[in-house]
Amino acid sequence: MTIGAIIIGDEILSGKRQDKHFAKVVELLWARGMALDWAQYLGDDRMRLTAALAASFASGDIVFSFGGIGVTPDDHTRQAAAAALGTEIVLHPEAEREIRGRFADETTPQRLMLGEFPLGSAIIPNPYNRIPGFSIRRHYFFPGFPVMSWPMLEWVLDTQLAHLHHAVARDEQAIIVYEAPESALLDLMNRITQAYPQASLFSLPSFGGEGVRRHIELGMRGESAAVEQAMAEIRAEVARLGYEWAAR
C-alpha cells in the first residue's frame, strides 16, 4: 500500500512558517511499521489543489493532507476535494453535533461551515477543540495546526489503519564508507537495487570537513530480510574493493 502526504499553505512555501508535519508523519508511520512513499507541498491555489487531489484519488493511495480545511478565503481544501471527486460539500450531521457541542449557544452559520465536507465523507474527531477533520476515499484531511492534527493522525493510524501496522517487518541499516567516490560503488549499488526490490538503497555522500573524513553513508531501508541480506553483500563488496568502512 502506497502512502502519501500533502502539506498545504502559502505560509509554508513562502517560508513564513516552517513545516513540521513531514517529519512527524514519518515518525508516526515508522513507529507502526509503515513508511511514507511520497510527499507534496502545495500553496493555497484551488485549481492546483483540485488537480493534485484528483490525481491522488485516482491513484488509490492512502493520503494524509494537512491544512486549508478552515473557512477563511485562503482555505480551499474542502472545496478542492469535492471538486476532485465531482461532488459537493454538505454539512455533515456528526460534524454539526460536534460543533454545536463545542459552541452551544454561540454556534453560528459561519462556525457550522467548518463541518461542511465532500458528500460521503466520514469525520475525524478532534480532541483539542471538537472541530473535526474528514476522510473520504482513503484520504484523511487534517487542520494545519500540529496541536490538533497530530492526535487526529494518530487516531486514524490506530483505528482506521491498524490493520497495516507492522504488516511487513521493516528495518534500516547503513555503513560509512571512507574515501570512496560514488562512481566506484555504482556497479554495486545497481546490482543490489535490482536484486532486492523489497528494499530501497540510499547513498549519502559527504565531502567531510575539519576532523571529518570524506565518506559515503550507504544503506538500505525496507523489508527486514531483504535489508539484512543486501547489507551483508554491501559490506563484503566494499571490503573486497579495499575501502575502509564502519557501522553507522
What spans do the regions from the language model cover?
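Glycine-rich phosphate/diphosphate-binding loop of Rossmann-like nucleotide-binding domains
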Residues: 1-39, 44, 228
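Structural motif
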Residues: 4, 61-62, 115, 122, ...
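Glycine-rich beta-strand-to-loop/alpha-helix junction loops that act as flexible
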Residues: 8-10, 65-73, 204, 221-223
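N-terminal small/polar loop signature for handling phosphorylated ligands or for N-terminal nucleophile
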Residues: 26-84
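Short beta->alpha linker loops
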Residues: 41-44, 94, 112, 180
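Proline/glycine-rich low-complexity loops and linkers
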Residues: 48-51, 75-164
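An accessory alpha-helical subdomain
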Residues: 138-237
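Conserved short beta-strand edge segments in small beta-sheet-based binding/regulatory domains
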Residues: 201, 237-248
